[in-house]
Amino acid sequence: MNRTAPMKQRSVPLSSIMPSEEQSDGFIDLDRLVAAVFRRARLVAAFVVLFIALGAAYLLFATPYYTSMTQILLDENLSKYAEEEPTPVNSQMLDTQIASAVEILKSGELALRVVDKLKLSENDTILNPPRSPVDMVKEWLKTATGLFSGGPDVTEEAARNGRRQKAAAIIQQSLAVERVSRSSVVAVAFRSSDPLLAATIARGYASAYLTDQLNANFEATERASVWLQERLTDLQQRSQAAALEVAHFRAENGLTAARGELMSEQQMADLNSQLIVAQADTASASARYDQYKSIVDQGPENAVKNATISSKEGDNSVIRDLRTRYLTVGKREREVSDNFGADHPQAVSLRAEQEDVARQIYQELQQLTASYKNEYEVAQSREESLRKSIQGIAGKTSDASEQLVQLRELEQKAAALKTLYESYLGRYEQATQQQSFPIAKARVISEAGVPVSPSSPKKTMTLALSAVLGMMVGGAYAAFLEFRERTFRLEGNIRSILGHRSLGYVPLLGTRMKKKAQLVHAHFGSVKRHDEAVDDTMPFQRLSRIVVDAPRSTFAETFRNAKLACDQMLAGSESRVIAIASALPDEGKSIIAANFAALLAASGKRTLLIDADIRKPGLTQMITPAPRTGLVETLIGEASWPAGIKVDQRTKLAILPAGGASHQRHQSNELLASPAMANLIENARNAFDYVVVDLAALAPVVDAKAFAPLADGILFVVEWGRTPSRLVRDLLHSEPLINSKVLGVILNKTDMNELGKYSDFDGAEKYRHRYGKYYVENTITENTAA
């Protein structure tokens, strides 16, 4: 019994010497993006076809609707010859008028007028239009609710009014009113399943709107005329009474004078005019004085900076010249300081000159301030003098003017009443004239015609939108699938995620063969020649001999690569115990174990295949549904292990099944970790060159962990495109012993037709079609067909 310890070099993860995909590039990989697009193109195309089919179904069952449109121009010029002074219209008023017109056209009152004029309350097309399935359900629910709730009897008049209101509500829903761009045109469109009815109602709306405008103008003018006539009668009586009162007051007080006023009043008027001028001069002088005083009060430096002098003043030329010189010197000083430094002699000289000019400007400002102060005091004195003169004259004429004031009050009252009367008289005559001009400020510029083609649904647009929507939904779903891709697709995924060696791809087998493998069992014991026909009742032999029947296939090449990896990494061991494990059930590890063992046996090596998946013995079920003895009976001491071995006469493969029906009563993990199991493995090492053990899945049970110390190496099986990568990574990282004994990972059930779609353009999977001269894939189908 010579046994060499497993080489520790296999426990070194490949991730330590190979960069991961996440570390390779932080930018968007265009190759992967294009590959994803091509990979999901069929899915997106299927969604596009589906949505186009839905769009076509919608077009097939949808009710066609026709739209007829009329255009109304709101033109103020239509009534300008009927108005003496047309009101000018600005853009804001125009927007308001058009908005008001749109709301009037949408109003329920105008809809009722259209219903009454066209008798739409008796039109079945309006009251009972074609309904969608949703509308039919709503109508059914409404009817059912009405049956249970009941209600008072409806009179014929109420029913007629209800139909009228319903027709108005329906045409309001089918009406579309909008302004045409920024023009004064309003477009009125009506939508109906009957093209002739659509044109009729659109015309009816235009006619009803024009009639409404005429009626509104006439009614407003009539109401204004009645009110103006009442006001005119009252104003006429009051104006006559005021005129008589003025005449009587003049005659009683003898108030007659030239130009209708006293001399003292004329003098008072002249003085008042002079006082107004003097007040203006005083205010102007005060403003100038305050301006210069505020500048001077700021000090020399700020006064120079803030000395803003009006160009209309004649005494500021000196200040302007000095200020110009100040700015010029300051500019030169900054240039010299920037070029030669602030301590340069010329810069110092220029700053001194600038300060001197500032002092001169300040002195000039002080002189101007004193001058304007004198002007302000003179103007103030003149204003005070005029006030005193006015007060003196006012005292002399106060007695005479008291009666004149009363007279003027009477005259003003009479004049105001006369002016008001004349104004109302003119408005009354204008309103009377407008009643005889029935002109609306709108006209129809485009008559509604009968549409010849439906406006909805639009076939081309519907199908195009369906295609776009299908592309968007399909693209979103494809992107979701791509972002949710968390499985193993490529050998590079094995290296980057798990840090282990990938042993290759095992192609996906036909479903017909696997279904038979679950329904019937194989028969052993008789030796058959290689050229004999394989019976349909032996699917296990077919599945387990694929590697033998198709030696030049991709399937067989993967197992040869696995054998080579085992021989290299377990070199020095005369007998090797190799476990076959997976993370989840139904990943095909039993078929992998059977073919791997068959390859070893066919190569002339003494090989034992043990089904150690005691809880779910898939390998045993394929061999014989109810074996009498097996692994469990051996471990509990009921039988010896050679008694339970089955031998494949073709490959000379020895197979030890899981056991009989009683194996479910025992704790599988305790059996696999028992001394009896260790003794069995030791005995098997002495009798066989290779011992291949089919273990239970690693995630659901601990059986694989219990057996791991007895294995020299582990071949890990993952299902292509289904096994979650994070699950496998976490399981292996949480079990260092198992992880250290993993010889490599096999990607099982690989769809070889889809494999290249998941690879980069420079990936090895893209060039597998060039390996055809080395492989003969059709032998798998020929030699394993039923």
Curated annotation (Swiss-Prot):
Give me the segments passing through the membrane: 43-66, 690-711
Gene Ontology terms for molecular function? ATP binding; protein tyrosine kinase activity
Database matches in InterPro entries: Bact_polysacc_biosynth/exp, CobQ/CobB/MinD/ParA_Nub-bd_dom, EPS_ExoP-like, GNVR, LPS_length_determ_N_term, P-loop_NTPase, Wzc-like_C
Sorted alphabetically, which Gene3D superfamilies does this protein's record hold?
A: P-loop containing nucleotide triphosphate hydrolases
Location in or out of the cell: Cell membrane
Periplasmic compartment segments: 67-689
User: Which keywords appear in this protein's UniProt record, sorted alphabetically?
Assistant: ATP-binding, Cell membrane, Exopolysaccharide synthesis, Membrane, Nucleotide-binding, Plasmid, Transmembrane, Transmembrane helix, Transport
Q: Which residues lie on this side of the membrane: Cytoplasmic?
A: 1-42, 712-786
Q: Name one Pfam family in it.
A: GNVR
Annotated pathway: Glycan metabolism; exopolysaccharide biosynthesis
Q: What is its main location?
A: membrane
| Single Gene Ontology BP annotation | polysaccharide biosynthetic process
Of which family is this protein a member?
To B.solanacearum EpsB.
| Name of the featured protein | Succinoglycan biosynthesis transport protein ExoP
Q: Which gene encodes it?
A: exoP
